[in-house]
Amino acid sequence: MNFNNNNNNNNNNNNNNNLNNNNNNVNNINNNNKKPLTNSLAGTPPAKKILVIKNLKQIPKTPDNYEDSSWNKLSSAITSINMKQATTLTQEELYKMVENLCFDKILASNLYNKISVQIEKHITLTIKHLVLTMSSDPIIFLKSINSIWKDHTNQMIMIRSIFLYLDRTYVIQNSNTVKSIWDLGLFYFGNNLSQQSNLERKTIDSLLYSIRCEREGDEIDRDLIHSLVKMLSSLNIYTKFEIEFIKETNRFYDMEGNSKINEIETPMYLKYVCERLNQEGERLMRYLEQSTKKQLMAVLDRQLIERHVDVILEKGFNAMVNGDRLEDLGKLYQLLNSVGEIKKIKESWQSYIKQTGIQMLNDKEKEATLIQDLLDYKDRLDRILSQSFSKNELLTYALKESFEYFINTKQNKPAELVARFIDSKLKVGGKRMSEEELETVLNKSLILFRYIQGKDVFEAFYKQDLSKRLLLDKSTSIDAEKSMISKLKTECGTTFTAKLEEMFKDIELSNDIMNSFRDSPMTQNFKSIEMNIYVLTSGNWPIQPPIEATLPKEFLEYQEVFNKFYLSKHNGKTLKWQNALSYCVLKANFIQGKKELSVSLFQTIILYLFNDVIDGGELSFRDIQANTGLAIPELKKNLLSLCSSKSDILIQKKSSTSSNTSSNTSSNTSSSASGSASGGASGGATKTKVIDETDTFLFNSKFSSKLFKIKVNSIQIQETVEENQKTNENIISDRQYQVDAAIVRIMKTRKTLAHNLLISELVSLLKFQPKPVDLKKRIEILIEKEYLCRDPENAMIYNYMA
């Protein structure tokens, strides 16, 4: 062949030389005849040129016996390869034979057919030998067939390299009817595998057996499995294996999943599922085709997750949330999210939040710490939402909705307790916090505030507590107070905080008034008394009715002078003194030294009486009541505070006729007062005492304390039962006005409206959650007042009356 190619090349070179010579001749003619062409020459057609290739030689004819001779050598080479022996001729020599035969299409076709027969014959004999020597042990069998497959592929690689020219010419030219040498080997191998004693079935079953052993914890030869799976894929029978593999996987995890879900706890089951998912993922990567992934994972999802979702959540969800098991909850979320069951988590999430929250609200023993407990509860849920549930939007909304639901199952109490909680943080006497810590607590409190529907209840109690903090100088920081007001304004608008802001303005204005008053000549006679007076706008403050009391002469004179001063500058205004919110700092002489006592005005009045009593002298309850003018319940509360074990400024003495049990009034009073007796100078637990009207009292001159400034337990800063009741009554009254105004406003616009529609609009309009029965009562009252009337034809329709 090379000889022929060289001849062609030489001929081509000669042709090129001839052409070049011709070109040179043409150039010479042109150079010699530079005259312009005449008309006769221009009209004569040019002579035809003939291309002549000199020294052209034909391909020599192959000898008659060349085909048989070449095939014998090629066949012998194939046999040597199949026998794992060296060939007598080099690969290059064998390749040349194939190349020479392929120049003739008939010889090429004959060559292809002979190769096909020899390949088929060898594979058939090999597979038959495998059947005769086949082991019943699946692993040994797999090793045997893998060895044959490896030999086959190695042999076919060598055979293909010899007959590569045949592949590139004859096979490509007849690709619709013949296979490549490599595909020919695969075809015969696959056919024999299927036809010989169901060898294909045994191969698939043995592979499934090995995979099952691995799933049960045994070690297997993964390279062996990978090789055989690749064999099935190459032979186009992987799909058959895949079908059986999925069936086997389904059976395996059906049984194992049912067993595990009943045997182990939910966290362990979730761990088991994750491990199985990882194992199957690794199995896919190591020896399975990626086309199997979707079906395989669908089986695991169905058998290990979807079928057991309800059991998983019922058995373990609450326990995992209670135990703050973030990692396990994260696994739960990932697994259920992968099968589209987030809604099931949402249902369990909502149920847990509501049930736990309602239990917390109903635990009366922990009412004092309820708000802090709720904040801790919310923090825990937020942590789960963030770290375990990836801040899923559906679960985030479910948390908000559930928290709002349970916190409003008790309409007024949570709102009151949130206000009380904020009061405890802004009031002197609580745990000291940095500005950052206080800001954090206030922000968290606002989260609960947002959930509360009865914001008017919060407003009422917050205003009550704020008034005491401002008037009794119990606020830790005015800046913190104003910051809280600003937060409330952002949440609810200016209307909500208008009166709260006015309270601060009253305090600031009062300071200016007092500075002016102290500089006036009217106070020259009162230099021994340092008094601070707050002038409050009655509409802005939660002012209770004044409590009657007989004040010392100095106090009355000071009040009278201030009255004249203020009214002289504010003509037409009147002042009403709120003595119940006043407090004093007294200097008291005891045997062990002087002390400063911080007490309420009413306690001051009581202590003043003992200035006129000789040492060791006593005053009866009735004497004190007559001289102070205080009502009996009020007097009992203040005496109890002065006699408590934390202060012991006064010593209580029981008469022989005193009852061991108190009346209802005394019991309520003592309970309230004993609860307020905190923060005094002396240590020890507060003893619950009862003040009887037959008791006598004497000044404790032996009182001792390491502190110079003594804060006598005062009931002023605490909300009394009466004040609490009054606040709730005011809330109810305000709500009635709001409902009436809303009804009139709606009906004035609509003129005519059905009962259900009116109720619906009221619920959406009001800031609190009213009961339908209460709304119905207000409608009836407005009908009586002739703001509304029933439609003559339908009693469930209301008409507005101008």
Curated annotation (Swiss-Prot):
Q: Which UniProt keywords apply?
A: Isopeptide bond, Ubl conjugation, Ubl conjugation pathway
Q: Which domain of life is it from?
A: Eukaryota
Post-translational modification, as annotated: Neddylated. Deneddylated via its interaction with the COP9 signalosome (CSN) complex.
UniProt keyword annotation of Zinc-finger present: no
Q: Ubl conjugation: present as a keyword of the record?
A: yes
**Entries under SUPFAM superfamilies matching the protein:** Cullin homology domain, Cullin repeat-like, Winged helix' DNA-binding domain
A Gene Ontology biological process noted in the UniProt record is: protein ubiquitination
Query: Where in this protein does the record put region Disordered?
Result: 1-43, 656-686
Matches recorded under Gene3D superfamilies: Cullin Repeats, Cullin, Chain C, Domain 2, Winged helix-like DNA-binding domain superfamily/Winged helix DNA-binding domain
Supply the Pfam families for this chain: Cullin, Cullin_Nedd8
Gene Ontology molecular function: ubiquitin protein ligase binding
Q: What does this protein do?
A: Probable core component of cullin-based SCF-like E3 ubiquitin-protein ligase complexes which mediate the ubiquitination and subsequent proteasomal degradation of target proteins. The E3 ubiquitin-protein ligase activity of the complex is dependent on the neddylation of the cullin subunit.
The protein, known as: Cullin-4
Source taxonomy lineage?
Eukaryota, Amoebozoa, Evosea, Eumycetozoa, Dictyostelia
